[in-house]
Amino acid sequence: MGKRLISQRRGRGTPTYRSASHRFKGKIKYRAYDSIESEGSLKGKVVDIMHDPGRTAPVARVKFENGEERLILAPEALMLNEEVECGVKARVKPGNSLPLSEIPEGTPIYNIENRPGDGGKLVRSSGTYASLITHDADKAVIELPSGELKALNPQCRATVGVVAGGGRREKPFLKAGKKYHALRAKGKKSVTVRGVAMNAVDHPHGGGNRQHPGRPTTVSRHAPPGRKVGSIAARRTGKRR
């Protein structure tokens, strides 16, 4: 009997293939939108800036005046002991979070809520930002890093500034081991071995005196998991002519 495929082992979810979430610093979410934020602003102080293995951007720990502690995505140029604010009366300054209706047009923003109160879903990778194009009483239009224009509720919150850690993709990994550990922290595969390069016990396409599948590579949609590799339920194969 052959061995299970990597896709089968990953699906089982053993520790080998799980992300080490116990090392992550925590969730990045805006605080509940209460009367403090809807009528004024709440100030806090940055007490720590940390690296989070599960993210590409640095994370800052903020202690607010009311005793709450929250993790936020650090913007560029944020420093320890710097003051940040959240609420409708907060200043338009990097690190401060406000509703889109209170942010001037053309301002770079990040960690944007998709729906009011969801805590922030859009534009959270290092070095990224969106631009607020326009807003009125009914909707706010932002330009995402991809260039797509998206209309949102003007009560959705966002943080002013650019996410710290820019230029990350310009620095090469140089070594396969560095790439392995970077992806391993998030539970991702670092390398993909071809089936024809494996032994017959490891993959349906493995074995033989040369590298070839040895059988048709198209398989049924209803094939069992150990045989479901190659072109799954393909309508056609080969070059388009």
Swiss-Prot record:
NCBIfam families listed in its UniProt record: PRK09612.1 (NF007180)
Family listed: Belongs to the universal ribosomal protein uL2 family.
SUPFAM superfamilies assigned: Nucleic acid-binding proteins, Translation proteins SH3-like domain
Coiled-coil stretches noted in the UniProt entry, renumbered to this chain: none
Job of this protein: One of the primary rRNA binding proteins. Required for association of the 30S and 50S subunits to form the 70S ribosome, for tRNA binding and peptide bond formation. It has been suggested to have peptidyltransferase activity; this is somewhat controversial. Makes several contacts with the 16S rRNA in the 70S ribosome.
SUBUNIT field: Part of the 50S ribosomal subunit. Forms a bridge to the 30S subunit in the 70S ribosome.
Organism of provenance: Methanothermobacter thermautotrophicus (strain ATCC 29096 / DSM 1053 / JCM 10044 / NBRC 100330 / Delta H)
Ranges of compositional bias, category Basic residues: 1-12
GO molecular function annotation: rRNA binding; structural constituent of ribosome
PANTHER family (UniProt xref): LARGE RIBOSOMAL SUBUNIT PROTEIN UL2, RIBOSOMAL PROTEIN L2
One example of a Gene Ontology biological process annotation: cytoplasmic translation
Gene name of the record: rpl2
Keywords for the protein's UniProt record, in alphabetical order: Ribonucleoprotein, Ribosomal protein, RNA-binding, rRNA-binding
Region annotated Disordered, chain positions: 1-21, 200-241
Gene Ontology cellular-component terms listed: cytosolic large ribosomal subunit
Name the record gives this protein: Large ribosomal subunit protein uL2
Pfam families in the cross-refs: Ribosomal_L2, Ribosomal_L2_C
